């Protein structure tokens, strides 16, 4: 989605040379389970351990809902959820196979569609971003809103709308100055 172009500081992972069950191995495998196809994530199977609450899902603008008014598609490209066979409301944290939507943001598939180098698909080549340009933009905007010196609201709004233009693929998700609040910045951090 272009977000990888914003990486400033990353922990590099290589499926052949940095084998660990932590890092992005954990993120990709633990978020895969239920009726998900692990091949679509570029791994050999899931650990069935991570889903999100509906409150997190609701931070994204839905573009489609099912008969129960549960979101199934989103305008924001950052909303990467597996919904098939999953419930919208995660009321049982012990039940991954059906409780809550799974997040599919981290995959062992490159931006060109290539699967990682580990032939067994145990260990991903997916790098873990520690600092991204998006974080810098969000920090700038938060500092301005908290009264920090040296910044201005118009620049902060411009930075936030750059993130949203990337996320929506157009200016359709951009916000107005009146929408730029600390609560909005907190929600935007979650979406990023």
Where are these regions (language model features)?
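Elongated scaffold/linker segments in the mid-to-C-terminal portions of large proteins
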Residues: 1-137, 146
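Generic detection of long, well-ordered alpha-helical segments
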Residues: 46-47, 54-57, 153, 175, ...
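Conserved catalytic neighborhood of penicillin-recognizing serine enzymes
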Residues: 160-191
């Amino acid at each position: 989605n272009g977000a990888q172009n914003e990486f400033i500081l990353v922990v590099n992972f290589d499926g052949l040379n940095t084998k660990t069950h932590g890092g992005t191995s954990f993120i990709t495998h633990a978020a895969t389970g239920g009726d998900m196809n692990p091949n679509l994530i570029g791994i050999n199977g899931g650990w069935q351990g991570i889903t999100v609450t509906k409150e997190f899902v609701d931070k994204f603008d839905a573009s489609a809902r099912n008969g129960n008014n549960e979101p199934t598609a989103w305008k924001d490209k950052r909303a990467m959820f597996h919904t098939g066979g999953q419930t919208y409301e995660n009321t049982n944290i012990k039940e991954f196979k059906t409780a809550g939507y799974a997040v599919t943001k981290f995959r062992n598939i490159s931006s060109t569609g290539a699967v990682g180098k580990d032939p067994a698909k145990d260990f991903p080549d997916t790098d873990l971003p520690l600092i991204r340009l998006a974080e810098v933009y969000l920090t700038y905007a938060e500092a301005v809103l908290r009264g920090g010196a040296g910044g201005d609201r118009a620049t902060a709004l411009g930075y936030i709308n750059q993130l949203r233009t990337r996320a929506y693929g157009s200016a359709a998700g951009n916000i107005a100055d009146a929408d730029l609040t600390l609560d909005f910045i907190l929600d935007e951090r979650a979406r990023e």
